[in-house]
């Protein structure tokens, strides 16, 4: 005698074994335990801590390992007309695939989503933080509004890339937001790829971007995300080719032009990178970010004495952003101004509230001064915290000459990129 669940294709027999249409299911232990919990609770929600306590038997369970397990259970259940639905912020539950179509988002939800996207376009930490909070509220209030969940994943990936959020928690939140969405939803695969890149799961990210490109080969966000993936995986030439196409499609997007400039340097096209950076400044007068970025690129490619005065002028504002001090210290280091460089670096690290990821940006000026051990220590602290931004930082051309030659540098490359990075 078996006990039938609300999802009638599945059942538990008297011995507690799983059956589908009268046939016993053969599953690995974790998947079997997860599905048993879902069946026992159906149609209710199983919380994540319940999975950890029973399926993981009290051992540590990461959000990512649970998500992978759920994905395998989904593959098993889909042909049987049953799906595992993610309930944002709570857990998972079993539902029949013939569930009612959710109601369309309200006008207020659409307006909140549009506002969050506008904030994200500002590309500032404050605006991105506000966008994330707005999207979190929106997803809680309208969990069936797929574009809002995609936008939340996108915003979290961007914030992680800047070093402003703890990577493991943010990536897990972003992947959970995408969980269970229609595979055809615009931007879904590209955002998942960006999140996986921040978790250093580059092979999985590559597969996500392949799906994204198949669905939207000329989408600017898709191409930009894939280009970044290529930079992380040390294919600067491939990244430059994609970014040139994105620049054609979105010629005025600052983040596109800055990423192209960075890719040109990484690919060995220094003079072209300087020209692109200077053109971006001319096309966007008064932008502190583009000016600072241009000075950093010029000092990396061809340091000139006149760059010092320009860099120091950036620091004279009443409320100088942290990135200005990073750029100023790098410019000074490339000009051999050791004492002035260390004054900025030491002050920033000792007297400012910086995350491990933000502190790692000072490794570049230290490396330029030959302080490789100290630079490696900053990078190691960020890698040990699994800061997603390190995928880009360790590919910085400022580190290309010393990281592969330094014992600590080789260990860093291995920990983030794997054995292939040392070949």
Predicted regions and their residues:
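Specific register positions within alpha-helical solenoid repeats of the TPR/Sel1-like families, i.e.
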Residues: 120-121, 157, 161-164, 197, ...
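Conserved structural position within tetratricopeptide repeats
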Residues: 139-140, 179-183, 213-214, 245-248, ...
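Structural signature of tandem alpha-helical TPR/SEL1-like repeats
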Residues: 127-133, 162-177, 199-211, 233-245, ...
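Amphipathic helix-loop-helix modules that constitute alpha-helical solenoid scaffolds
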Residues: 96-136, 140, 150-173, 420
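Alpha-helical protein-protein interaction modules
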Residues: 240-242, 253-423
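Short amphipathic alpha-helical recognition elements used for nucleic-acid or partner binding
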Residues: 23-55
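DNA-binding patch around the recognition helix
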Residues: 2-12, 25-26, 38-39, 61, ...
């Amino acid at each position: 005698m078996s006990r039938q669940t609300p999802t009638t294709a599945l059942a538990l027999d008297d011995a507690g074994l799983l059956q589908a249409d009268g046939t016993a299911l053969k599953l690995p232990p974790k998947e079997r335990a997860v599905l048993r919990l879902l069946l026992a609770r159906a149609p209710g929600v199983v919380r994540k801590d319940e999975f950890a306590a029973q399926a993981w038997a009290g051992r540590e369970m990461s959000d990512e390992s649970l998500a992978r397990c759920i994905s395998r259970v989904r593959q098993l259940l889909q042909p049987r007309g049953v799906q595992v639905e993610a309930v944002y912020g709570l857990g998972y539950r079993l539902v029949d695939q013939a569930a009612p179509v959710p109601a369309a988002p309200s006008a207020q939800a659409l307006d909140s989503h549009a506002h969050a996207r506008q904030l994200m376009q500002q590309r500032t930490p404050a605006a991105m933080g506000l966008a994330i909070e707005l999207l979190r509220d929106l997803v809680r209030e309208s969990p069936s509004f797929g574009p809002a969940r995609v936008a939340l994943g996108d915003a979290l990936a961007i914030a992680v890339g800047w070093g402003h959020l703890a990577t493991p928690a943010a990536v897990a939140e972003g992947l959970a937001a995408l969980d269970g969405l229609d595979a055809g939803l615009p931007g879904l695969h590209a955002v998942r790829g960006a999140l996986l890149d921040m978790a250093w799961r580059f092979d999985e990210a590559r597969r996500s971007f392949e799906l994204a490109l198949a669905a939207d080969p000329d989408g600017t966000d898709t191409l930009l995300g894939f280009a970044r993936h290529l930079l992380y995986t040390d294919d600067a030439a491939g990244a430059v080719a994609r970014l040139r196409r994105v620049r054609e499609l979105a010629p005025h997007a600052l983040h596109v032009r800055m990423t192209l400039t960075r890719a040109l340097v990484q690919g060995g096209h220094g003079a072209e990178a300087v020209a692109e950076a200077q053109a971006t400044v001319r096309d966007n007068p008064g932008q502190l970010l583009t000016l600072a970025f241009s000075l950093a690129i010029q000092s990396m490619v061809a340091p000139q004495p006149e760059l010092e005065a320009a860099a120091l002028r950036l620091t004279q504002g009443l409320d100088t952003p942290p990135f200005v001090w990073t750029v100023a210290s790098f410019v000074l280091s490339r000009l051999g101004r050791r004492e002035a460089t260390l004054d900025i670096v030491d002050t920033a690290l000792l007297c400012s509230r910086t995350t491990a990821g933000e502190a790692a940006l000072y490794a570049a000026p230290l490396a330029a001064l030959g302080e490789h051990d100290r630079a490696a220590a900053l990078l190691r602290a960020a890698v040990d915290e699994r800061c997603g931004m390190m995928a880009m930082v360790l590919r910085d051309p400022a580190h290309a000459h010393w990281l592969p030659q330094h014992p600590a540098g080789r260990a860093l490359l291995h920990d983030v990129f794997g054995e292939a990075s040392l070949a």
